[in-house]
C-alpha cells in the first residue's frame, strides 16, 4: 500500500537525463527557452515531495474505499477530489496539455505521473482526463471543444475511458462491436 511511500528518483533522473533524448526534445520550438536539462532534477524532486505529501497520505484509504456505485451515483474517496484539484491548480494535470508554449513534454508528464502513481495507485485515473481532453482537442468539433475543454483544463470536469467489452480490455483489435453514424453527427448506433 502507498502510505509508506518510498521512491528513489535516481533511476528516473538517469533515464530522463542520460538515456532518453530529453535534451533534444527541449530544443523543439514548443519547449525551447522553457526547460533545460538542469531543470529536471528540481522538477523531479518537487514532484517527489508532492507525491509524498499530497498523494501518499490517501493511498491506503483510497485502495480500501474503491469506487462505489449506488442508486445511479458513482462515488470516489473524498481524497480523489482533493488531490485532483491540487494537481489541476498547480499545473500537473490536464491544465498542462493545452496547446500553448511552455507546457511539459509528454515524456516528463509521464515521469511525473509515475511518481504520483507510486504514492497513490488509485490516483492514476486522473491521467484519463488528459487523454480524453487530448482526444477532443485533436478530433472534436469546435462546438465540442468549447463545451468540454475549458472545464477539463481547469479541473472542473474529469474524463474517463469506457471499456465496453470485457474480453477486449484495451486491445482495440479484439473489439467486436461497431459504431455507425446517424443523421445526428453526435450520435452513433
Predicted regions and their residues:
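Amphipathic, small/basic residue-rich leader segments at the start of a protein or domain
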Residues: 1-127, 139, 143, 147
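Glycine-centered flexibility sites
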Residues: 91-94, 101-103, 131, 140, ...
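Short loop-to-beta-strand entry elements in the cores of soluble alpha/beta enzymes
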Residues: 128-135
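Glycine-rich, Trp-frequent "lid" loop and neighboring beta-strands that shape
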Residues: 143-189
Amino acid at each position: 500500500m502507498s502510505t509508506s511511500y518510498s521512491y528513489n528518483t535516481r533511476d528516473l533522473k538517469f533515464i530522463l537525463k542520460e538515456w532518453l533524448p530529453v535534451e533534444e526534445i527541449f530544443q523543439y520550438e514548443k519547449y525551447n527557452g522553457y526547460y533545460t536539462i538542469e531543470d529536471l532534477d528540481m522538477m523531479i524532486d518537487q514532484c517527489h515531495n508532492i507525491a509524498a505529501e499530497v498523494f501518499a497520505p490517501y493511498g491506503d484509504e483510497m485502495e480500501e474505499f474503491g469506487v462505489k456505485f449506488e442508486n445511479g451515483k458513482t462515488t470516489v474517496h473524498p481524497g480523489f477530489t482533493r488531490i485532483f484539484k491540487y494537481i489541476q491548480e498547480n499545473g500537473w494535470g490536464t491544465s498542462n496539455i493545452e496547446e500553448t508554449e511552455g507546457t511539459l513534454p509528454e515524456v516528463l508528464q509521464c515521469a511525473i505521473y509515475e511518481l504520483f502513481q507510486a504514492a497513490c495507485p488509485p490516483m492514476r485515473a486522473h491521467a484519463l482526463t488528459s487523454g480524453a481532453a487530448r482526444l477532443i482537442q485533436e478530433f472534436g468539433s469546435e462546438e465540442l471543444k468549447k463545451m468540454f475543454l475549458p472545464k477539463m483544463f481547469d479541473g472542473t470536469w474529469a474524463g474517463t475511458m469506457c471499456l465496453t467489452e470485457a474480453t477486449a480490455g484495451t486491445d482495440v483489435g479484439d473489439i467486436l462491436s461497431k459504431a455507425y453514424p446517424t443523421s445526428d453527427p453526435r450520435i452513433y448506433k
